[in-house]
Design a protein with these regions (language model features):
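Kelch-like beta-propeller repeat domains
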Residues: 1-143
Length: 143
């Protein structure tokens, strides 16, 4: 999960750090439209970190019975994944600031792309929970 935002000047290769995301995210998607970068959803790592901690605990456990209980707890964490963040953000390049936008209704996909057509964006498929892909296509309008 990262909250760093970098800008690269393509001709010179110069990189500059911009204002951080209000919260660290990974695997979200976004588009650029009229001097703003729109970031849709993302994984804040809450469940990921808990699952990774459980895996480490399982690996370090020697007692078979306790290990089975830990595996069951880890599996439950994964099966009951709440989904990813449905928060949306816009970064205004002119003011160097973030604006919180209305969230998506329902689950927000990650590990996908967004396509812009005019002021409409399309987010096809993606994961809505860890390992759970969706066939939904989200369509939105930037106003």
């Amino acid at each position: 999960m990262y909250d760093n935002v970098l800008e690269m000047e393509l001709l010179s290769g110069k990189i500059r750090e911009l204002t951080q995301l209000p919260k660290a995210l990974s695997a979200g998607t976004g588009v650029f439209y009229e001097s703003k970068i729109y970031v849709f959803g993302g994984d804040d790592g809450t469940t990921f970190k808990r699952v990774e901690a459980a895996i480490l605990e399982i690996e370090n456990q020697e007692d078979g019975k306790i290990k089975e209980e830990l595996i069951a707890r880890k599996n439950s964490l994964q099966e009951n994944h709440p989904g990813f963040s449905n928060e949306n953000w816009a970064y205004d390049l002119k003011s160097d600031s973030w604006i919180k936008l209305s969230p998506f209704n329902g689950l927000s996909p990650v590990t996908t792309t967004a396509v812009l057509n005019g002021n409409q964006f399309f987010i096809p498929t993606g994961e809505v929970k860890a390992g759970v892909r969706t066939n939904q296509i989200l369509i939105g309008e930037i106003k």
